[in-house]
C-alpha cells in the first residue's frame, strides 16, 4: 500500500530521506510544534516552530514517538521528507486527527 499526506492543502506521496515510498502510517494525533528543540540524538526529533508531527505512540516515560514530515529541499517534485523519533510532548499544540491516508 502506498501512502499520501495532506500538508498545507496539498496531497503528495510520502517518501523517506532516500526518496523511497513508505507504508501508510496510522497516527493517533497530529500536533504542531510551538517551540524549537534541537538534539544530536539519532532517536529523537529536532523540531522547528510550525512543524507537524504525526504521533504514533505516547511513551510511559513522558516522551512521544512520532513522525515529522517536511517538504524536501527539491520542491520540483513536491515530495516530502520523513523523520521518525521521540520528542517531548510539552512542545506542541494539537493540530488535527489522522490527516495521513492510504492511496
From Swiss-Prot:
Biological processes annotated in GO: cell division
CDD domains xrefs: SH3_Sdc25
Residue stretches making up the SH3 domain: 26-97
A UniProt-annotated Pfam family: SH3_1
UniProt KW keywords: Cell cycle, Cell division, SH3 domain
InterPro entries listed in its UniProt record: SH3-like_dom_sf, SH3_domain
Gene3D superfamilies from the UniProt entry: SH3 Domains
Protein name: Putative truncated guanine nucleotide exchange factor YLL017W
Source species of the chain: Saccharomyces cerevisiae (strain ATCC 204508 / S288c)
Amino acid at each position: 500500500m502506498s501512502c499520501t499526506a495532506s500538508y498545507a492543502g496539498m496531497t503528495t506521496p510520502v517518501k523517506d530521506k532516500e526518496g523511497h515510498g513508505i507504508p501508510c502510517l496510522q497516527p493517533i494525533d497530529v500536533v504542531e510544534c510551538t517551540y524549537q528543540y534541537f538534539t544530536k540524538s539519532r532517536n529523537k526529533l529536532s523540531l522547528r516552530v510550525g512543524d507537524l508531527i504525526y504521533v504514533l505512540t505516547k511513551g510511559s516515560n513522558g516522551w512521544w514517538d512520532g513522525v515529522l514530515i517536511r517538504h524536501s529541499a527539491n520542491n520540483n517534485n513536491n515530495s516530502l521528507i520523513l523523520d521518525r523519533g521521540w520528542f517531548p510532548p510539552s512542545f506542541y499544540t494539537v493540530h488535527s486527527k489522522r490527516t495521513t491516508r492510504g492511496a
